[in-house]
Amino acid sequence: DLVSWNLYLGWYVPGLFLNDLWMDFFHLVYPNRPLGFSEYGAEGMPNLHSAHPRRGDHTEEYQAKYHEYMLKCFDRHPWLWATHVWNMFDFAADARDQGGEPGMNHKGLVTFDRKTKKDSFYLYKAWWSEENFVHICSKRFTDRTEKEIEVKVYSNQKSVTLYADGKKLAE
């Protein structure tokens, strides 16, 4: 027998680290039972942003932070038999009223209209695709108040170099 769980630790329940604890405990108690994640995800809206993303804020940045953690968490638990991100696309959900848009679930990696790929989409592309690419994260986050910002990219390349005004800033 095998089992998969729908868990949203770090989204509905505070604490991304709880995913590691839960998986380790399950494996300790049931060392011979294959474990999978049949649903995991966090809502992210490409029009909501934060320099300090936090659980439940529906920002594109928190959704990316959540998925970054989960992919690394899955790597730390090689005995998982399957993981299933929830969901490829945002979708209608009549009874929902979260994130400022009633009737929608924004856990997708791509918007409901299939037009906008969220930053989290490119995280998975970096992990899984062989197509060469670089994606600059938070590029829709234009109304900022910080003096300095961190530039984050997702890429499947060995290295990426950042230039601004012809000057090399980072590699």
Where are these regions (language model features)?
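Extended substrate-binding grooves/exosites of carbohydrate-active enzymes
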Residues: 1-171
